[in-house]
């Protein structure tokens, strides 16, 4: 089973993901957690290339295609092999991030980038995507409290980030069977409980389908 976590930086998705992984492992599920861009050496190098502040002014299509190239490598070398071994794979970001950030905020087209990725990934889609929804103001407050250095996309302005949010919301409407919204404005404990509930329900359906 393949689960992806999406949302603006600062939404708390990574923290919730780590807790869910531990919870599922305590239930004796085999779980691997990964991230995008990244997940293996080549993709991590592409991550550094894209997100480094030296990349300011990068052409939108260059940015989008680098993300997609890293994703294709990640899918074939990490995600699919673990799925074949019976693991639950949870990825911090996947194709919807490129659709939202580059398709929506960079203006390349939400529908166009969504379909392009589906073709490149040969129709491969997550079994479940959780979209952590949070207002721009709350996301910015959380980001400003982080001690680590911000990457190039973290430092984009309000107009860009609002466009990302709108694109994610558009995807939620278009793919309601795959994408579930998590209210990330709640406390970390409430977010974890809601995330856990949605994932456990999906796992039960997945197990029934396998029988």
From Swiss-Prot:
GO terms for biological process: dTDP biosynthetic process; dTTP biosynthetic process; dUDP biosynthetic process. This is Thymidylate kinase. Pfam families: Thymidylate_kin. One of its GO terms (cellular component) is cytosol. Keywords: ATP-binding, Kinase, Nucleotide biosynthesis, Nucleotide-binding, Transferase. Phosphorylation of dTMP to form dTDP in both de novo and salvage pathways of dTTP synthesis. The lineage of its organism: Bacteria, Bacillati, Mycoplasmatota, Mollicutes, Entomoplasmatales. ATP binds at residues 7-14. Its EC number is 2.7.4.9. InterPro entries: P-loop_NTPase, Thymidylate_kin-like_dom, Thymidylate_kin_CS, Thymidylate_kinase. It comes from Mesoplasma florum (strain ATCC 33453 / NBRC 100688 / NCTC 11704 / L1). Coiled coil: none annotated.
